């Protein structure tokens, strides 16, 4: 998993990922809010999560233990200073190398998959970390919309040099994933 060290990441992501807050609203208020009453959740696994994501999970599952796996020490410290979850365990590790029990009812993996070295193995490890019937909350950046992204991110005020650099170096910065490729990898990992 790629390591991010920018403390302004939470602000910049909203400029770089058009619809970031809409994505969070759909996930937490549109889907999980409706599912939460019927779910028995004791443990949540959060991979490279941001403040709003952790707060959303904590508000829906206040009694659940949360394990946060983050490869960047700087980002992990930033999370700890902004999110106060007494029941949280914070691991400064790449998820691929973390030793975890296979007992999580929910795994949150938002905008991470495109940065991992081997997405298939990453998804398999997530599957193995979930309890039977566990829920994966997954979003990823698809290269199929890169031109649209460049225009919209620029219009939303993202740093022009960063946008252009990301656009030009997309293949070197992140995996090129299509929705169908991810669907196939999920199926291969065991998800239904």
Can you say where each PLM-predicted feature lies in the sequence?
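Conserved class I S-adenosyl-L-methionine
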Residues: 135-161
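N-terminal, positively charged/glycine-rich alpha-helical extensions of SAM-dependent methyltransferases
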Residues: 1-10
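A short acidic, Gly/Pro-enriched loop at the edge of an enzyme's catalytic core
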Residues: 96-107
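Short alpha-helix
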Residues: 172-189
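A short SAM/SAH-binding and catalytic strip from SAM-dependent methyltransferases
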Residues: 105-120, 142
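A short glycine-rich, Lys/Arg-flanked "PGG" loop and its adjoining helix->strand segment in the class I
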Residues: 120-135
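Class I SAM-dependent methyltransferase SAM/SAH-binding core
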Residues: 40-97
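Conserved alpha-helix/loop element of class I SAM-dependent methyltransferases that forms part
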Residues: 18-40
């Amino acid at each position: 998993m790629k390591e991010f060290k920018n403390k302004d990441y939470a602000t910049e992501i909203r400029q770089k990922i058009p619809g970031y807050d809409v994505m969070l609203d759909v996930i937490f208020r549109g889907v999980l809010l409706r599912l939460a009453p019927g779910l028995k959740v004791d443990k949540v696994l959060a991979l490279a999560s941001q403040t709003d994501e952790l707060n959303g999970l904590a508000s829906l599952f206040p009694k659940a233990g949360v394990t946060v796996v983050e490869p960047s020490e700087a980002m992990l410290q930033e999370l700890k200073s902004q999110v106060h979850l007494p029941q949280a365990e914070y691991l400064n590790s790449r998820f691929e190398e973390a030793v975890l029990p296979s007992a999580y009812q929910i795994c949150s993996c938002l905008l991470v998959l495109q940065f991992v070295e081997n997405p298939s193995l990453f998804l398999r490890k997530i599957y193995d970390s979930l309890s039977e019937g566990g829920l994966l909350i997954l979003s990823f950046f698809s290269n199929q919309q890169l031109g649209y992204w460049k225009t919209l991110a620029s219009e939303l005020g993202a740093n022009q040099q960063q946008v252009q650099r990301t656009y030009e170096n997309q293949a070197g910065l992140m995996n090129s994933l299509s929705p169908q490729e991810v669907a196939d990898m999920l199926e291969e990992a065991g998800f239904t």
